[in-house]
């Protein structure tokens, strides 16, 4: 299923939960909406590239598996 940007934004806000939810939402939105690289996101959020990839993959799984 394809989502509009506004629908996807709302789904991310509603479905990405947890201890670091705000950070994870920001990372997922920057990656999906702005196309920011994993490397740049890692620098921006002071995380490893692997951590950023895991956040994005898990977030995409939550959003797109429904």
Regions found by a protein language model. Give the residues of each.
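Short, Lys/Arg-enriched N-terminal segment that forms or immediately precedes the first helix
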Residues: 3-17
